[in-house]
Amino acid sequence: MEQSEKTEAQYVDRQGDLSRSDSDGVDGLSWTKEEEDKLRHKIDWHCVPIVTVLYLLCFLDRINIGNARIQGLATELDLNRGVRFNWVLSIFYIIYLFVEVPSNIILKKVGPRFYLPFLVVGFGFVSMCTAFVHSYEGLLAARAFLGVFEGGAMPGMAFFLSCFYKRGELLFRIGIYVSAASMAGAFGGLLAAGLAQIPEWGIASMRIYAWRNIFFFEGLLTVIIGLLAPIWMPTDPATAYFLNERERRIATERLAREHKSHPDERVSWAHVKRAMLCIHNYTCALGFFLINITVQGLSVFMPTILADFNYDPVKAQLMSVPPYVCACLGAIAIAYLSDKTKQRGLYLAIFAVIAMIGFAILRWHQDSDIKYMAIYFVTIGAFPGGPAFLAWAINNSAGPSVRAVSSAYVVTLGTIGGIVSTWTYIKEDGPRYPNGHTVNLAGQIGVFFLAIFGILYCLRENKLRAAGKRDHRLEGLNEDETLHLGYRHPSFRYIT
């Protein structure tokens, strides 16, 4: 019994506020708050910017097909026949879906420094090749290969950051890099408007013009940055090149004390089961699924929706920029507040209501100016949801292996929302797209109720654990087995 009490006392989490002037580690290592703040500042400058840039390129190469569509792609490759364009979008997410979990397991084994840039170079090269496609079938193949490389990017980057940051620090950082998705929408609209104007160039049958310029130059930029990324990207806190020896020890120990797990543990089937059987992960995955219907749908179809407001192609590209900029700033602000207040579900519920208002206006209002205002509501309301659900799942997963599987698992199920999104706005439903707006409105209502459920579930579990109703899980376990309980440990507390 004494051993059990000792182990439990060592495990207590205190929700991310453990290691300020700590001296109870195994090796007696202690540090001050000032040292930890300085360390976190260094990590911020060396990890967050590179991940943000890489994810911006990832999302840019994913959604540029929406910009290319109104610059002649659909007409030249006969994508307006039936639902061909929707199949081109779907094939990407179908492949993407099956890549995420295996990719994160590989990442855990080989490390992120070269693996993540490898993925970036891969999808950048595929984007360049898309510029030379001359048929519907060729475009399908290109999008499938894009899914192979992009599938591991988002969950991989989330796991990478979780290896450097404590639970209470994570959402703000994930919020910054995932906000690159909305910035890619803004940046993509500006780039597309400019690149499409470049005069035709190339040789023989490999002529590049209009929509082909979009794929070629955006892909080329991605490849160049991907090749340079390993110079800047660290592998893990224990070997980070920008930290001195003491800082490396602090960076490693502060995470070990919070999660009470072995940082170098190998992924096993037990970790996979623990991640996939967690009720909270199901909640976050379903929420991510519903959010993705909106975010992925808007990212690809916004130029088309705006073009149906009677804007010409160039104006439609440019008018998509301001809503994305607002969404980006909003996502970062909410991520910051969420980390400061250690609340996740509350902000998800509030912003779901904002998105609901926007989709209600788009569904039932006629005036184009009012509907354009509604675009701001839906982007600001929906875009913060993805990083919030992902961070919420990672926050409530203990141990690097479980976090790796959890992040990939949540994004994998969420990717099904991306598949659904490709069928929400079909050509026959335009120009008002009532069915697409109705589906998204229903999805945001679902997000609201899932956020409320997640809060109540976490509060209930924390209350039961505080009352000793989960202490039976420690019976018959030695210290090492107790450390591997993860989120099931009686002293683990969920972030709400």
Roles of regions detected by a PLM:
Residues F114-M128, L346-I361:
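Structural signature of the two symmetry-related core transmembrane helices
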Residues F98-G111, L329-Q343:
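Helix-to-loop junctions at the C-terminal end of transmembrane segments
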Residues I70-F85, V110, M128-L140, V148, ...:
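Extracellular/lumenal inter-transmembrane loop segments of multi-pass membrane transporters
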Residues I63, Y93-V101, G151, A186, ...:
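Residue-level signature of mid-helix packing/kink "hotspots" within the transmembrane helices
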Residues G66-N67, A270-A335, L390, T422:
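Extracytoplasmic gate region of multi-pass secondary transporters
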Residues M1-I63, I70-Q71, P230-S261, E265, ...:
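Intracellular terminal tails of multi-pass secondary transporters
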Residues H46-G82, V99, S103, G188-A192, ...:
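Extracytoplasmic
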Residues L97-E137:
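Conserved MFS/SLC helix-loop-helix module at the cytosolic interface between two early adjacent transmembrane helices
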